[in-house]
Every structure is written in C-alpha cells, then in structure tokens.
Amino acid sequence: YVSLALPIVYMIAIWVMSSLPHNAVIELPNSKIDVFLKESLHLVEFAILYILFVIPLAISGKLTFKTSMIVAIISALYGITDEIHQSFVPYRSATLIDVTKDWIGVIAAWAHVRYHYFHRQKSILNKLTNYYAKITN
C-alpha cells in the first residue's frame, strides 16, 4: 500500500509547489539558468508521476499495456489540472506550452516503459518484478 500511496503523495507535493510563487523554494543567481531549469522540470515532473504509478503495477504483476496507458493518461491529465490550478495562484501562470512539456515528459516515459518493459523485457521494472516474485514465493 505504501507504493500505491507514492503517486498520490507526489501529486500533493506538485499541488503544494504549484501553490507557491515560482521563486519560493529556490532562485538561482543567473535568471536565464533559473528559468531554463524550472521550465525543463516540466519534462521530468510528470514523467516521474507516471513512473511512480508504473512501479507498483509492475511489481504486483498488474502492469499491462492497458494499465500503462491509463496511468499515462492520468499523469497527463494531472498536468492539465496543475496548469489550471496555477492560473488561480498569484505570481504564477498557466500556459499551453507548459502542458505540452508535461505531456512530452509523460509520453517519453510511457514510450520507454513500452519499449523496455513490454518489448525487450530487460528494464529495471522487469528486474524488480522478477525479484519481488522470488522473495514472495
């Protein structure tokens, strides 16, 4: 149950961070680098959310192409929810380009899982699944 709670806790963390001004946690001295890094995090942020859904599914043997697609859609839709939320937060904004970056991150992670877990079967997820099967039998 702890592993199933991880994506929910992460979603709450995203929500809380989105409620703060963009420079509330950290602001780098070089504003161009600061903006670049924070904008680049959109690509990673929702990919991590997708992976946090995928790991417990893989370990429990419930990761199928369909469940992978479902959690990818949930992760991508949460990106939209996050942008809508940010539109109501002072000093924050919501943009279509941010949603696009969120979705690109999810799609990249989904494609990686699709190729390595379902086709090659040589991913860390496969190793985790096999390890879990050994210790529970």
Task: Place the predicted regions along the sequence by residue.
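Membrane-helix interface segments
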Residues: 1-2, 62-70, 95-96
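"…centered on the first transmembrane helix and the immediately adjacent amphipathic helix/loop
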Residues: 1-54, 131
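Small-polar-interrupted transmembrane alpha-helices in polytopic inner-membrane proteins
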Residues: 9-16, 67-87
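Interfacial helix-loop-helix junctions of multi-pass membrane proteins
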Residues: 28, 80-101
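Membrane-interfacial alpha-helical segments at the cytosolic side of multi-pass membrane proteins
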Residues: 45-60, 104-118
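Membrane-interfacial, low-structure loops and terminal tails that flank and connect transmembrane helices
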Residues: 121-137
